[in-house]
Amino acid sequence: MADLLKFVQNEFVAKKDFPDFGAGDTITVFYEIKEGEKTRTQFFKGVVIQRRGSGTTETFTIRKMSGAIGVERIFPVNLPALQKIEINKKGAVRRARIFYFRELTGKKAKIKDKRR
């Protein structure tokens, strides 16, 4: 059964070429929104909190501050509405899931840049 799922995922799911990113990176996600007859492109810029899953069920969570309110959005990697992902900044974190980032405020909420 697992082999059948892998076969279907590999054959029929369209692979998109997104850059490699992980927790702590600041990225901008451009996605398409349909409002009635019109379609427009909207972007969501924030810090990646986690990546989870594999294959067709892989998702990533982005957090941004809108005023004083934190907004999180979960995107499936294989979402057809995703147009492109830009990496704005690589962050140096030691965890794969940085949920502690939700409680941090002010200068503590800054993520250091990854050294090259």
Curated annotation (Swiss-Prot):
<protein>
    <recommendedName>
        <fullName>Large ribosomal subunit protein bL19</fullName>
    </recommendedName>
</protein>
<dbReference type="InterPro" id="IPR008991">
    <property type="entry name" value="Translation_prot_SH3-like_sf"/>
</dbReference>
<dbReference type="GO" id="GO:0006412">
    <property type="term" value="P:translation"/>
</dbReference>
<keyword id="KW-0687">Ribonucleoprotein</keyword>
<comment type="function">
    <text>This protein is located at the 30S-50S ribosomal subunit interface and may play a role in the structure and function of the aminoacyl-tRNA binding site.</text>
</comment>
<dbReference type="Pfam" id="PF01245">
    <property type="entry name" value="Ribosomal_L19"/>
</dbReference>
<dbReference type="GO" id="GO:0003735">
    <property type="term" value="F:structural constituent of ribosome"/>
</dbReference>
<keyword id="KW-0689">Ribosomal protein</keyword>
<dbReference type="InterPro" id="IPR038657">
    <property type="entry name" value="Ribosomal_bL19_sf"/>
</dbReference>
<comment type="similarity">
    <text>Belongs to the bacterial ribosomal protein bL19 family.</text>
</comment>
<dbReference type="InterPro" id="IPR001857">
    <property type="entry name" value="Ribosomal_bL19"/>
</dbReference>
<dbReference type="GO" id="GO:0022625">
    <property type="term" value="C:cytosolic large ribosomal subunit"/>
</dbReference>
